[in-house]
């Protein structure tokens, strides 16, 4: 028994064709929106590529750009089919193309669903990418005179100011690395020499942070050096007092920014997926109800439309049998080829 068999008269067929035509062009606009979102996300990721460890994070924007382009191309084509389906003289030329087109639509809908899922599941890989990228960026913060790294100081400073964050996980990350270049330390100073010699790796480590970690909303002048030294500042206790530094780490700030953006885009992708599924089902109904018209010369006559010619269970069973028969045929051909090869050698 056919799945979701429905009777169609001329009026219902016309309404179905007109509704599908409108939905197809809505899907084209949705495809443009997907493409635009992919381009925007790619630009946002490229802006901060210096603090990202690899290019894996570009899978989502690339997928959105591809899905948007395909949505525009695939939905412009059935718009013409729906328009011509109302004319009995024009529709027959589209008949051979409809089944292959519906198969392509099914594959496209699977991929667009997968893209939507990835938008929501990308947080884990993005977190790892940002953690490693920010760590490397902070390590090279001091290298303002080394080609290829001289821009990182500006990048990190602008990042911390824009996202109101400090360090990777927090401001204490700056205490664990040398962020002041040796050329600005004054190597002859006894204090500098003692601090470098006291470190196993020979680095100049201080309990200080770059200026970009300072919170301008604080009423107190920024304490960016000797942050943990209470005696160095008047009426100050770093353990009880709210510091005038950003407390949030940049990894958390960037992660929240990108994941909220990708979640919104994921919602949009699923909305487009629902629209595409509706169009595909509608096209299947249109295809079958036009094929089952008893008398093509009488457009007023009733016809039947369905999604699957058999029940879902029977369709899956017959599809599995087809796959198995194709597998057996492939084995027979392989065996025949091997026998022919042996005969040639002998």
From Swiss-Prot:
Membrane-spanning parts: 25-43, 62-80, 100-123, 265-290
Main location: membrane
Keywords in alphabetical order: Cell adhesion, Disulfide bond, Glycoprotein, Membrane, Transmembrane, Transmembrane helix
Ranges of the Lumenal topological domain: 44-61, 124-264
Residues in compartment: Cytoplasmic: 1-24, 81-99, 291-346
Glycosylation sites: 229
UniProt-annotated location(s): Membrane
Membrane topology: Multi-pass membrane protein
InterPro entries per the UniProt record, alphabetical: Peripherin/rom-1 (IPR000830), Peripherin/rom-1_CS (IPR018498), Peripherin_LEL (IPR042026), Tetraspanin/Peripherin (IPR018499), Tetraspanin_EC2_sf (IPR008952)
Gene Ontology biological process terms from the UniProt entry: cell adhesion; visual perception
Cellular component terms (Gene Ontology): plasma membrane
Tissue: Found in both rod and cone photoreceptors. Specifically in the rims and incisures of rod and cone outer segment disks.
Keyword Membrane part of the UniProt annotation: yes
Gene3D superfamilies: Tetraspanin (1.10.1450.10)
Quaternary structure note: Homodimer; disulfide-linked.
Protein purpose: May be involved in the morphogenesis of retina outer segment disks and the development and maintenance of the retina ultrastructure.
PANTHER family referenced in this protein's UniProt entry, alphabetically: PERIPHERIN-2, TETRASPANIN
Family as reported in the entry's similarity comment: Belongs to the PRPH2/ROM1 family.
Name of this protein: Peripherin-2
Record organism: Xenopus laevis
């Amino acid at each position: 028994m056919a799945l979701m068999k429905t009777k169609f008269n001329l009026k219902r067929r016309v309404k179905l064709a007109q509704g599908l035509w409108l939905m197809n062009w809505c899907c084209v606009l949705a495809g443009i929106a997907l493409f635009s979102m992919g381009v925007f996300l790619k630009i946002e990721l490229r802006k901060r590529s210096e603090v990202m460890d690899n290019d894996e994070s570009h899978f989502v924007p690339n997928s959105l750009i591809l899905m948007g382009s395909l949505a525009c191309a695939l939905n412009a084509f059935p718009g013409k089919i729906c328009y011509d389906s109302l004319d009995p003289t024009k529709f027959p030329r589209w008949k051979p193309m409809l089944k292959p087109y519906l198969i392509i639509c099914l594959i496209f809908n699977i991929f667009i669903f997968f893209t939507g899922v990835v938008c929501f599941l990308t947080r884990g890989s993005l977190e790892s990418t940002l953690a490693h990228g920010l760590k490397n960026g902070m390590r090279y913060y001091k290298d303002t005179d080394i080609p290829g790294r001289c821009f990182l100081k500006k990048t990190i400073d602008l990042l911390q100011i824009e996202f109101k964050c400090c360090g990777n996980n927090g401001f204490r990350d700056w205490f664990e690395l040398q962020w002041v270049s040796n050329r600005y330390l004054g190597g002859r100073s006894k204090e500098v020499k003692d601090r470098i010699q006291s470190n196993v790796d020979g680095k100049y480590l201080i309990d200080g942070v770059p200026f970009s970690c300072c919170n301008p909303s604080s009423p107190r002048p920024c304490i960016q050096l000797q942050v943990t030294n209470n005696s160095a500042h008047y009426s100050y206790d770093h353990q009880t007092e709210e510091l005038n530094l950003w407390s949030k780490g940049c990894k958390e700030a960037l992660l929240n920014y990108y994941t909220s953006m990708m979640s919104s885009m994921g919602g949009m992708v699923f909305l487009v997926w629902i629209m595409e599924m509706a169009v595909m089902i509608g096209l299947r109904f249109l295809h079958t109800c036009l094929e089952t018209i008893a008398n093509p010369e009488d457009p007023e006559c009733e016809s039947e439309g369905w999604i699957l010619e058999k029940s879902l269970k029977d369709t899956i069973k017959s599809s599995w049998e087809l796959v198995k028969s194709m597998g057996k045929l492939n084995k027979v051909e392989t065996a025949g080829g091997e026998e022919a090869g042996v005969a040639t050698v002998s």
